[in-house]
Amino acid sequence: MILRAALLLVLTGLLAGCVSSGTVDPLKTDEGRQQARDAYIQLGIGYLQQGAAARAKTPLRKALEIDPRSADAHAALALVFQTEMENDLADKHYREALSSRKDA
């Protein structure tokens, strides 16, 4: 019985050691920021595809907070404004998207 209790304690300790402490903020790494930006862009595009253009703005703006030069975020936001007939804002974001392209 004592052996079982000791074994259970050791296994519990080992498992607890395998759990990440979660102290690393994923937005502090380039990879984490890119993943967050891409997730926000996909969420915004999803809302736009569902016809929720106004709702798409929030995640797309968050993507731009993470990466203000994201061509994809600017292009998606331009589509949102175009859908809402906000032509000046759409034009602004289309131009930002074009100037932000890495291969331009």
Language-model segments: what does each one mean?
Residues 15-35:
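Bacterial Sec signal peptide processing site at the extreme N-terminus
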Residues 32, 66, 99-101:
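Structural marker of alpha-solenoid helical repeat scaffolds
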Residues 36, 70, 103-104:
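Residue-level recognition of tetratricopeptide repeat
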Residues 49, 83-84:
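Register position in tetratricopeptide repeats
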